[in-house]
Amino acid sequence: MAEHCQHQQYHIMTNTNHSEDHYFYLWRHRYIDDITDAVITRTCFGITSNLDKRQNGYEGHVGHGIKWSGTWSGPERQIRELEHRLKSAFRDYLFSGHNDAVYEWVDETIAFEDIRNWVQWEVENTFADIVKI
């Protein structure tokens, strides 16, 4: 019996189930505006349980390779809360497109560095279980 309990304890300690981790990401995207030909830089943010699959999705939409500008990992609940806080803090600066749909893109009036620094501060001061990767 003791051997069985030791085996169960070992399984719990070594199988932390990383599949439950979720990811918060930032992506700095530059594009050329079709109307003005100006180069616009916006910051995209979001959450996913699979960074590779999410990256493939973006690449399929934009037609070129992308590189995350920042990624963090942690429990789903905390990752969702981090995203919610960013949406609330930058609510007035989220890009709104066709039919006034609001997207997880912070408009070009906010510098990427300001968004990244905001996320880093939140992670360091609010979310003990989220780590930068």
PLM segments and residue spans:
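Non-catalytic accessory segments flanking enzymatic or RNA/DNA-binding domains
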Residues: 2-133
